[in-house]
């Protein structure tokens, strides 16, 4: 069987993501074994990047 539209109906038996033990978000991938949000299972450090944060506006000193 292919991987087209007909097979998407068979994808509801097991969830792809479950609740993460570390951050509590539904981002822990069962097959890959790590959390997409905090990186639990992949690294001991918390997953964080500068591009994912909102930038604070700096006040001009004029």
Curated annotation (Swiss-Prot):
The gene is rpl37e. A zinc finger (C4-type) spans 20-38. It comes from the Archaea. GO terms for biological process: translation. Its cofactor is Zn(2+). Binds to the 23S rRNA. Belongs to the eukaryotic ribosomal protein eL37 family. One of its GO terms (molecular function) is structural constituent of ribosome. This is Large ribosomal subunit protein eL37. Signal peptide: none annotated. PANTHER family: 60S RIBOSOMAL PROTEIN L37, RIBOSOMAL PROTEIN L37. InterPro entries: Ribosomal_eL37 (IPR001569), Ribosomal_eL37/eL43 (IPR011331), Ribosomal_eL37_CS (IPR018267), Ribosomal_zn-bd (IPR011332). Zn(2+) binds at residues 20, 23, 35, 38. Binds 1 zinc ion per subunit. Keywords: Metal-binding, Ribonucleoprotein, Ribosomal protein, RNA-binding, rRNA-binding, Zinc, Zinc-finger. One of its GO terms (cellular component) is cytosolic large ribosomal subunit. Pfam families: Ribosomal_L37e (PF01907). The keyword Hydrolase does not apply. Disulfide bonds: none annotated. The keyword Acyltransferase does not apply. It comes from Pyrococcus furiosus (strain ATCC 43587 / DSM 3638 / JCM 8422 / Vc1). Part of the 50S ribosomal subunit.
